Amino acid sequence: MKNLTILGSTGSIGVSTLDVVKAYPDMFRVVALTAGNNLELLKTQIETFSPDLVSVLTAEKAQALSRSLTGKKPEIMHGVEGMIAAATASETTMVVAAIVGAAGLVPTTAAIMAGKDVALANKETLVTAGHLVMQMVREKKVNLYPVDSEHCAVFQSMAGHRSQDIARVILTASGGPFLNWGREKLQAATVADALNHPNWSMGRKITVDSATMMNKGLEVIEARWLFDIPVQRIGVNIHPQSIIHSMVEYVDGSVMAQLGTPDMKGPIAYALTYPGRVPSGVKALDLTALSGLTFFKPDTDRFPALQLAYRAADAGESMPAVMNAANEIAVEAFLGGRIGFMAIAEAIEKVMDLHEPHALASIEEVLEADRWGRRTAKEVLGVGC
């Protein structure tokens, strides 16, 4: 039996993870859960899975949660201290890192340093601190399993092959809700428009990232660290049907791909049960029902965020952390109705132009670069979000 901590249990990935866990009570036990603001859902999860420990955002929310629970209560903590306690709980053997954004970095690295295997859905951990995180993974001899559908697809497509045999990795992207929108129409895109993803059901932040194509840019950087492949050998193809989740091209010209119905329970179940497989609840793929599979190159004129991510990856050092921080602030401002859709990438570029990349030797230095990026993005945008 695997004992699990789920960081971000009330988010999209966390909820899907618990769906998988619930289907296999003889395989998994939930030791700890962490959540941000959704106390009602967390309360339901506590009643269903009986964790030993839960952590929420603030002391006030911890008190409110405690008052709402009846019967036997788990230990309730809050803040970063609570997240770290959940990530490093002695009985936990695997941590599902599903917190959105750079906030997931500290608890995820704490889990690694505590010797826990990690199912990684928080791509920002590798975007901001990839070199440090992979060094920790090697030193602690833990397993890092990708939960992003694209990286899970690459992981499966690389199985049994040597890294020197790989010519390139090709990540697929749906193109998001604005695939066929022109620049003029994009200028007037609303929050509701951006959140209307055609294929995937995800959280608000990642759905906006998909609309700008920053999500794919973050995934390029994540793949660079996960698979130790130069970013110049990681490409992106637009694939509107979201059936092929990514591909690996080998030096002999062969291409291996992983296909499946778009549903995050698939990669989650694979990460939780690797090297085995279990029925995940994902609808079986019927290729005969598809009218076709199409692919084309991304339009970086309409979606400049992807090119900004490649630029950050090429610059390296502190630039990816700063870019990610600027993106989080800009997306938050867009979701709050304070800036337009196209202003997201414009703000990120301005912040990157102001930044001089420098080496990052510790997680604290990564966090400082993150703080600089956030402060500068707020100044550039003129917002106080």
UniProtKB/Swiss-Prot annotation:
It holds the Pfam family DXPR_C. Pathway: Isoprenoid biosynthesis; isopentenyl diphosphate biosynthesis via DXP pathway; isopentenyl diphosphate from 1-deoxy-D-xylulose 5-phosphate: step 1/6. Its cofactor is Mg(2+); Mn(2+). GO terms for molecular function: 1-deoxy-D-xylulose-5-phosphate reductoisomerase activity; manganese ion binding; NADPH binding. It is an enzyme of class 1 (oxidoreductase). GO terms for biological process: isopentenyl diphosphate biosynthetic process, methylerythritol 4-phosphate pathway involved in terpenoid biosynthetic process. The keyword NAD does not apply. 1-deoxy-D-xylulose 5-phosphate binds at residues 123, 149-150, 174, 197, 210, 215-216, 219. It comes from the Bacteria. Keywords: Isoprene biosynthesis, Manganese, Metal-binding, NADP, Oxidoreductase. Mn(2+) binds at residues 148, 150, 219. Its EC number is 1.1.1.267. NADPH binds at residues 10-13, 36, 38, 122, 124, 203. InterPro entries: DXP_reductoisomerase (IPR003821), DXP_reductoisomerase_C (IPR013644), DXP_reductoisomerase_N (IPR013512), DXPR_C (IPR026877), DXPR_C_sf (IPR036169), NAD(P)-bd_dom_sf (IPR036291). It catalyses: 2-C-methyl-D-erythritol 4-phosphate + NADP(+) = 1-deoxy-D-xylulose 5-phosphate + NADPH + H(+). Belongs to the DXR family. Catalyzes the NADPH-dependent rearrangement and reduction of 1-deoxy-D-xylulose-5-phosphate (DXP) to 2-C-methyl-D-erythritol 4-phosphate (MEP). This is 1-deoxy-D-xylulose 5-phosphate reductoisomerase. It comes from Citrifermentans bemidjiense (strain ATCC BAA-1014 / DSM 16622 / JCM 12645 / Bem) (Geobacter bemidjiensis).
